Design a protein with these regions (language model features):
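Acidic, glycine-rich A-domain
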Residues: 1-222
């Protein structure tokens, strides 16, 4: 160490340097929360868990963006509570409020557009959802399907699965944090494939995500 200064100052070949990648700085986390009316009874708990997670990532210098989605009056609204470098914005997560419907396919398409704009490489996309897409605006008829269909059940799940596939193709595979009923677990797997983590309850949200991020960081270091 006493000779370390000689390498850059004098070009001393006896001393070499090696850049150690900052794996914490390489990882970026996107968190997307289902804010439809189905989350009404646990919205305070969701907000608290989201805040705990964002605060922990902020202290670890891991950039995180927190978003939510719901559909109101035929429009799918994507709300941003804090951006990657907005370290003072965690308190806004407590503004999380559940209302309206959830058109999951359109929400995933919007997120795909946002992620492709930013162009980050080491990204972890986490989606907290009950995997029960449902909207009052019908699916339009396309191709061999001449008539419009309700946005619910199999057609809605298929629509969301198609958009999840596009996210994977664009290099941003979504990881589903499933918080729904037993009967909707198969829908979660249809949409997200093997990338489904079932939460025993919303109270396990921050702890579960912490373990996922720890595993991703270990993978980056290896």
């Amino acid at each position: 160490p006493a000779l370390a200064w000689r390498a850059p100052a004098l070009g001393d070949g006896r001393v070499f340097d090696r850049q150690q990648p900052n794996t914490l700085g390489d990882l970026i986390v996107d968190l997307l929360l289902d804010a439809s009316a189905s989350q009404n009874r646990r919205q305070e708990q969701l907000a608290t868990q989201g805040y705990i997670l964002a605060e922990a990532l902020t202290r670890c210098a891991i950039p995180v963006r927190v978003l939510s989605y719901c559909s109101v009056s035929g429009c799918t609204v994507l709300r941003e509570y804090r951006d990657y470098r907005e370290n003072q914005g965690n308190n806004r997560i407590f503004e999380f409020a559940a209302a309206g419907w959830n058109r999951d396919g359109l929400a995933l398409r919007e997120v795909d557009w946002l992620l492709r704009r930013s162009g980050e490489q080491q990204r972890l996309l986490l989606i907290l959802t009950d995997a029960n897409p449902n909207d009052d605006t019908r699916l339009p008829g396309t191709g061999n399907q001449f008539f419009s269909r309700d946005y619910s059940g199999r057609p809605a799940v298929a629509d969301a699965a198609e958009e999840a596939t596009m996210l994977r193709r664009h290099g941003n595979p979504p990881l589903c944090l499933f918080s729904g009923r037993e009967g909707d677990l198969s829908s979660a797997r249809t949409i997200y494939g093997r990338d489904v983590v079932r939460l025993p309850s919303v109270g396990w949200f921050a702890q579960t995500v912490g373990k996922i991020i720890q595993g991703r960081l270990q993978a980056l270091e290896s």
